[in-house]
A protein has these predicted regions:
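Hydrophobic alpha-helical segments and their boundary regions
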Residues: 11-12, 39
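Intrinsic structural disorder/low-complexity segments
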Residues: 8, 14, 28-29
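N-terminal secretory signal peptides that target proteins for export/translocation
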Residues: 1-10
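Bacterial N-terminal signal peptides
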Residues: 13-24
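Intrinsically disordered, low-complexity segments
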Residues: 1, 19, 28-29
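Noncatalytic, solvent-exposed loop/strand surfaces
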Residues: 23-210
């Protein structure tokens, strides 16, 4: 790849990062995902901050200001996530997406420390599929243990964009392999069951732009 291509690629990736990875700035430890019982009224929250304005303002009415997970007060459903969860969940097209680690494994074949992006059904919290990313060999130098996926996803139509713990910008089909189709240019996913992510394309920033 020549310098012009690298520069162009870097501009594209930087634009993506401005949209996708802002959630790292608002990191918080969590081991559960809680969804409000308030009717969303069709109002998606498809990116960090809700809209490109990043003003964190919802146009929904009657939003609860208190929750009790144990008593299920103003809580629609609760599901376990990994031991650390950074960034923010996003909601789009009837699904909830959130990055975490593999400390609450959904697939017994996936063992050890991984970066995990999970998809759930918005109405009842049913687990739908997950994207799995191996840790970088350098460990703490580039990929701190158990931090998992730190970026907040961005959803546009039927495509989800996020940044992995390996510094890759990835586009996924929001249906995963549940639609029994392998979409996009990537056809060699190691995990391609019904509950696995369908990768459309991937851009490795560490390899391509240094």
């Amino acid at each position: 790849m020549n310098s012009i291509q690298k520069t162009r690629g870097l501009r594209i990736v930087l634009a993506m990062l401005m949209a996708v990875s802002g959630g790292v700035l608002l990191a918080a430890h969590s081991s559960r995902l809680t969804v409000s019982a308030s009717d969303p009224g069709g109002g998606d929250w498809p990116m960090w901050g809700g809209t490109p304005d990043r003003n964190m303002v919802s146009n929904m009415k009657g939003i609860p200001i208190s929750w009790d997970v144990q008593k299920k007060t103003n809580v629609k459903w609760v599901t376990a996530l990994g031991s650390q969860t950074y960034g923010n969940p996003v909601v789009a097209g009837g699904q909830v997406y959130v990055g975490t680690n593999n400390e609450a494994p959904r697939d017994p074949k996936v063992k050890g420390d991984k970066g995990i992006l999970m998809a759930f059904r918005e109405t009842d919290g049913e687990f739908l599929w997950q994207a799995v990313t191996d840790k970088l060999a350098a460990g703490r130098v580039n990929d701190w243990p158990y931090q998992g996926i730190c970026s907040s996803p961005l959803v546009e139509g039927k495509i989800l964009y996020y940044v992995t713990n390996r510094g890759e910008v990835v586009a996924l089909d929001t249906e995963g392999f549940r639609d029994k189709e392998n979409d996009g240019a990537v056809k060699d996913e190691k995990l391609n069951g019904e509950r696995d992510a369908d990768v459309i394309w991937k851009f490795d920033m560490m390899e391509e732009v240094g």
